[in-house]
Amino acid sequence: MGSSSFLVLMVSLALVTLVAAEGVKGGIEKAGVCPADNIRCFKSDPPQCHTDQDCLGERKCCYLHCGFKCVIPVKKLEEGGNKDEDVSGPCPEPGWEAKSPGSSSTGCPQK
């Protein structure tokens, strides 16, 4: 096999790999916008999802409160949806929005 044939083969394999990887990670994005996340994290939580397709119903995979989670998109909440969030622990003081590992400040009012 000549060097030009080998080069064509390698480029072809690279293109096929890129197209296949894009198809796997792509998928159909669900409607709505992810909520704003103003929390600074000391450590990221393990992801609960990787794409919108990992989430049930209308929920989207969004980075929120230190990790990727399935959440109801902002547009859906404005239309009367339910946050359906578990809130444990007090909300941080205004101006300090850091989340330490193991704590949860979801559902706290935004400024």
UniProtKB/Swiss-Prot annotation:
InterPro entries registered for this protein in UniProt: Elafin-like_sf (IPR036645), WAP_dom (IPR008197)
Taxonomic superkingdom: Eukaryota
Keyword Secreted: yes
Keyword Oxidoreductase: no
GO BP annotation list: antibacterial humoral response; innate immune response
Disulfide bond positions: C34-C62, C41-C66, C49-C61, C55-C70
Alphabetized UniProt keyword annotations: Antibiotic, Antimicrobial, Disulfide bond, Protease inhibitor, Secreted, Serine protease inhibitor, Signal
Sequence ranges assigned to domain WAP in this UniProt record: 27-74
Single GO term (MF): serine-type endopeptidase inhibitor activity
Localization terms from the record: Secreted
Annotated segments matching region Disordered: 80-111
Signal peptide range: 1-23
Any one annotated GO CC term: extracellular space
Summary of the function given for this chain in its UniProt record: Antibacterial protein. Putative acid-stable proteinase inhibitor.
Protein name: WAP four-disulfide core domain protein 12
Lineage: Eukaryota, Metazoa, Chordata, Craniata, Vertebrata
